[in-house]
Regions:
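Short, linear, compositionally biased motifs with a strong N-terminal bias
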Residues: 11-13
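C-terminal and inter-domain tail/linker signature
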Residues: 5, 21-189
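Bacterial N-terminal signal peptides that target proteins for export
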Residues: 1-8
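C-terminal motif of bacterial Sec signal peptides marking the signal peptidase cleavage site
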Residues: 15-19
Length: 189
């Protein structure tokens, strides 16, 4: 009887511990998923603007009041729509075949788009209004023909119209010039 009581007590505690640790997953609504998929398409339009060197296509997905934090350090100053447009044109003048490869460079995943999360405050969130994007930009330096590639990470906040309202991105901007310089050095005759 004592053995049976011990087994019962162990099973009872195991059940209590399991039920306390067994949390249900967060359910993403169909509306949130549709919004997330639309935002992925918005970002793909942005990257197609780079590939096609079409500044109007690139800017068509940006809110008029967009605030951009560029990948290069600039004293943490936000850049407006005009500055973003000028930067896009500068890339068009310097590079050809600008292509974004979503998820490229991630370890253990090829998914380049993420939204919703468990934040440091411990709160879970399924709202897709803020999207993280990971991937690699590949291009050819126009003047030298140097192939250039850069791992990239961006955080995009979308407004109610589905346009990008806040945009922060990170990549090794100086590494692009290093790749060009290395290419030129290795191809000297």
């Amino acid at each position: 009887m004592k053995k049976l009581k011990t087994i019962f007590t162990i099973l009872l505690f195991a059940t209590i511990i399991y039920s306390c640790n067994n949390s249900t997953g967060i359910v993403v609504s169909d509306e949130e998923n549709a919004k997330f998929q639309a935002q992925i398409e918005t970002f793909k339009t942005f990257t197609n603007g780079f590939y096609n060197e079409d500044i109007d296509l690139l800017m068509s997905v940006m809110a008029d009041s967009v605030q951009w934090s560029p990948p290069n350090y600039n004293g943490n100053q936000l850049i407006n729509s005009d500055g973003l447009r000028a930067a896009g044109i500068s890339y068009f003048e310097s590079f050809d075949g600008i292509t974004f490869n979503e998820g490229d460079g991630l370890v253990g995943s090829d998914n380049g788009f993420w939204s919703g999360s468990l934040y440091s405050a411990g709160e879970t969130n399924t709202d897709p209004s803020v999207m993280r994007v990971y991937g690699t930009w590949s291009m050819t330096h126009t003047e030298t023909g140097a192939p250039v590639s850069n791992k990239w990470y961006g955080v995009l906040t979308f407004n109610e119209d589905g346009k990008i309202a806040v945009f922060s991105d990170w990549m090794d901007v100086n590494g692009m010039q290093v790749q060009v310089n290395n290419y030129v050095e290795s191809n000297k005759q």
